[in-house]
């Protein structure tokens, strides 16, 4: 009987020591954000039948249970993906918004100063000084356009860099998760126990990769299989697949994301396939904010310069010569898909700038017919092919200079690409300024200047906007979208914090509770030590 008492006490001591070890580990890791609280699980030893009855044989330390709720953790992880998307989106929206409102002088104000100087020249067309001031203001306006264009192009390059960096991060996470799958499987096979510390690290990595790229996780035979973009495998068991930042086959100036498959074959993934995570936010900000801003500022420059040139050409300069183009302006481009098998070249021009939308287009050759869709909405556009060797649509004319397309060849038409880049004031001498309305007019003839001044108030863009109104609408659109994105981001972050609190209620360490448990274990240990 005495032996039984001592054995029972010893089993209790061993179990209590195990419990205290678990509690102390919880307390030590209380400040580790991804740590999951552990609980000691005890069992009752089988009893012994004796003539005097059935006697118990104490307790035993069974195992360490990791407090983990798969559903709550999945909610938190998915919420982090949405937060990551908004965070990256807002960051890039803010850059465009700052450019349009703070970083450079307001383009609308510069256009106003341009017409103010022009109106002053109209007050005394014979005053060379007033015309020189106007020409200086013209150069300042062109510089203003160019600076806005330069910064927007730099943002485009920065988007490419962001994509590269995100892809590098994703590949590192994938390798680490696959490595942990391998380590966890090895520990389980050798010891039969759960490597809770490794499980914690693996869940942390899944949460972190979800912040960068929205993923789905399926646990299979103890491994985490991680997929993204509608089912592409990022991690399968102990194997990690790779992504690659690559020039888009549609437009090699822009990066897309490729999936590296068997034999290192890279398959380009459509941008819209990415849902959640910072990478998705970067891609969305490019399509929804940066591209439209670039296109609209270049459209403003195109219509402004073209309409000014049209009126200037109707006047006469101080030498009685017909006015020439006042502004030089660039023209768009047509980009061939890298997978095209034929050879087709185009020369882009503008048949009617008032009809130009500013959007990009995708052209596809289907046998004997060219099909054109507007980007990014995919709306089919009617093409005028009445002129041989020419395609006309929405104010654009494409003359086919090399005509050897194959079935399925595609092209991206970028009507606004490079417009501002090649913009400059061509009239540098006041004597070349076509101020007069007639050839034989005197030095004070300002009739054509007055016609030029009228352009300021004419609704020449989209059939209903002045130059200043169009720019103000652009600024307002970007500002509104940025503000809404900030609100959405803040709301989503609060949801993520709420899910984290729910997760911590289950898996987090409560110092008070652990201290109470330690006291209880210590109290139960002391009587048994007396034996």
Regions found by a protein language model. Name each.
Residues 1-531:
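S/T-rich, low-complexity, solvent-exposed segments of bacterial secretion/appendage proteins
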């Amino acid at each position: 009987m005495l032996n039984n008492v001592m054995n029972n006490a010893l089993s209790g001591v061993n179990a209590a020591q195990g419990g205290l070890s678990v509690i102390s580990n919880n307390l030590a890791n209380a400040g580790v954000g991804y740590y999951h609280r552990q609980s000691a699980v005890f069992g009752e030893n089988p009893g012994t039948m004796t003539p005097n009855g059935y006697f118990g044989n104490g307790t035993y330390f069974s195992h360490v249970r990791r407090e983990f709720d798969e559903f709550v953790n999945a909610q938190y992880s998915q919420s982090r993906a949405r937060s990551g998307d908004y965070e990256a989106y807002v960051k890039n929206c803010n850059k465009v918004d700052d450019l349009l409102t703070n970083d450079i002088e307001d383009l609308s104000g510069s256009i106003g100063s341009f017409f103010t100087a022009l109106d002053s020249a109209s007050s005394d067309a014979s005053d060379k000084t007033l015309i020189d001031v106007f020409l200086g203001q013209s150069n300042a306006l062109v510089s203003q356009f160019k600076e806005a264009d330069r910064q927007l192009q730099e943002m485009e390059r920065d988007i490419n860099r962001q994509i590269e960096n995100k892809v590098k991060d994703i590949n590192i996470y994938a390798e680490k998760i696959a490595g942990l799958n391998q380590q966890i499987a090895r520990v389980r096979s050798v010891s039969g126990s759960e490597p809770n510390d490794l499980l914690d690290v693996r869940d942390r990595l899944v949460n972190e990769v979800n912040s960068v790229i929205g993923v789905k996780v399926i646990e299979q035979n103890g491994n985490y299989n991680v997929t993204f973009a509608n089912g592409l495998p990022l991690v399968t068991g102990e194997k990690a697949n790779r992504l690659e930042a690559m020039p888009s086959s549609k437009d090699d100036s822009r990066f897309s994301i490729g999936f590296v498959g068997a034999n290192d074959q890279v398959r380009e993934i459509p941008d819209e396939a990415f849902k959640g995570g910072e990478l998705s936010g970067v891609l969305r900000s490019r399509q929804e904010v940066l591209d439209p801003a670039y296109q609209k500022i270049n459209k403003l420059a195109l219509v402004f310069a073209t309409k000014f040139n049209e009126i200037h050409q109707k006047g006469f300069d101080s030498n009685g010569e017909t006015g020439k183009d006042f502004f030089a302006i660039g023209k768009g481009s047509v980009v061939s898909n890298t997978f095209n098998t034929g050879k087709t070249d185009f020369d882009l021009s503008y048949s009617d700038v008032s009809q130009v939308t500013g959007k990009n287009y995708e052209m596809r050759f289907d046998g004997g017919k060219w099909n054109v869709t507007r980007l990014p909405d995919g709306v089919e556009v009617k093409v005028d092919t009445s002129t041989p060797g020419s395609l006309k649509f929405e104010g654009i004319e494409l003359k086919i200079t090399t005509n050897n397309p194959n079935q399925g060849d595609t092209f991206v038409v970028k009507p606004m690409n490079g417009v501002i880049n090649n913009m400059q004031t061509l009239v540098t001498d006041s004597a070349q300024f076509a101020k007069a309305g007639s050839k034989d007019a005197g030095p004070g003839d300002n009739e054509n200047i007055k016609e030029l001044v009228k352009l300021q108030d004419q609704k020449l863009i989209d059939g209903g906007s002045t130059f200043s109104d169009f720019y103000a609408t652009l600024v307002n659109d970007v500002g509104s979208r940025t503000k809404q994105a900030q609100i959405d981001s803040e709301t989503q972050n609060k949801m993520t914090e709420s899910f984290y609190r729910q997760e911590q209620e289950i898996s987090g360490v409560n110092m008070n509770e652990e201290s109470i448990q330690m006291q209880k274990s210590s109290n139960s240990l002391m009587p048994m030590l007396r034996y």
